Design a protein with these regions (language model features):
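Carrier-protein-dependent adenylate-forming modules in NRPS/ANL systems
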Residues: 1-115, 128-129, 158
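Conserved S/T- and glycine-rich ATP-binding loop of Class I adenylate-forming
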Residues: 6, 23, 94, 100-103, ...
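Adenylate-forming
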Residues: 11, 60, 140-143, 167-168, ...
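Hydrophobic packing residues within well-ordered alpha-helices of enzyme cores
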Residues: 19, 63-64, 124, 197, ...
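Short acidic active-site motifs
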Residues: 40-41, 171-174, 224-225
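Short, conserved loop/helix-junction motifs that constitute active-site signature segments
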Residues: 46-49, 130, 203-210
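Core-facing hydrophobic residues within beta-strands of well-ordered domains
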Residues: 51, 89, 184, 208-211
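Conserved AMP-binding/adenylation subdomain of ANL enzymes
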Residues: 108-137, 145-185
């Protein structure tokens, strides 16, 4: 149906971002769902959103989604579609819907309009004196609103996303081996994730010579952490 939101199941990949843009250019908000989520979360989100379609970028778990069409990435890539600017999401239309964790019950959908997103991106790019064509650390899965702080500013500024996969962030050994090898100049995370990285002796200017900006959201930034940085 026209204006119905579309669920997108997958990880931190190019195909996910391409799917986001495909949805909004066809007039539909998208609902990103991380592929490490369980089947119950997927069904609860569908029950709340009434989404009639899920794009399967990564393999779906065994799940019974009644009256929901499953479209594989290969079917989209091989399809023949027309793009009409009149269909684009704009103004007060929902651009994306991100669902809460649901720890206190059913997940709740937070609806963000095109104008909301545009205002946020313009603010970030104009107020923080970021490098030209910035390279952002993309640590948060796209199902978290934190990810928007790197995703769309990177797209608008012809920048780059340097992805830190979810499985790496869950393993200190992998994390502390991987971070020093990554090249980015804008750090985006929660304050608590940065605090965790203080445990690594290589989390310093010597091992991250290009890093010029720290952008935090989602939590309060303690004064002590700001001083350490």
């Amino acid at each position: 149906p026209k204006d119905a939101p579309i669920m997108i199941w997958g990880g931190q990949t190019f195909e996910m971002i391409a799917s986001f843009l495909g949805c909004v250019k066809s007039g539909h908000a998208y609902i990103p769902i991380a592929s490490y989520s369980n089947a119950e979360r997927l069904t609860m989100i569908q029950d709340v959103s009434k989404s009639p379609l899920v794009l399967e970028i990564d393999p779906l778990p065994e799940v019974d989604l009644t009256d929901v069409k499953v479209l594989k990435a290969s079917e989209v890539e091989d399809g023949d579609f027309e793009v009409n600017e009149k269909d684009f999401v704009e103004g007060d239309d929902n651009y994306y819907i991100i669902f809460t964790s649901g720890t206190t019950g059913k997940p709740k959908g937070v609806q963000i309009s095109h104008d909301n997103l545009l205002s946020f991106v313009n603010w970030e790019l104009s107020d923080f004196n970021l490098p030209e064509h910035p390279s952002f650390l993309a640590q948060a899965p796209y199902s978290f609103d934190l990810s928007v702080m790197s995703l769309y500013p990177a797209l608008v500024s012809a920048g780059k996303l340097v992805v830190l996969p979810h499985d790496v962030t869950q393993n200190f050994g992998k994390l502390f081996q991987t971070l020093p090898k990554m090249q980015f100049n804008v750090w985006v995370s929660t304050p608590s994730f940065a605090q965790m990285c203080f445990l690594d002796k290589t989390f310093d200017q010597e091992h991250h010579p290009d890093l010029s900006h720290f952008l935090f959201c989602g939590e309060e930034l303690p004064h002590s952490e700001a001083e350490m940085l």
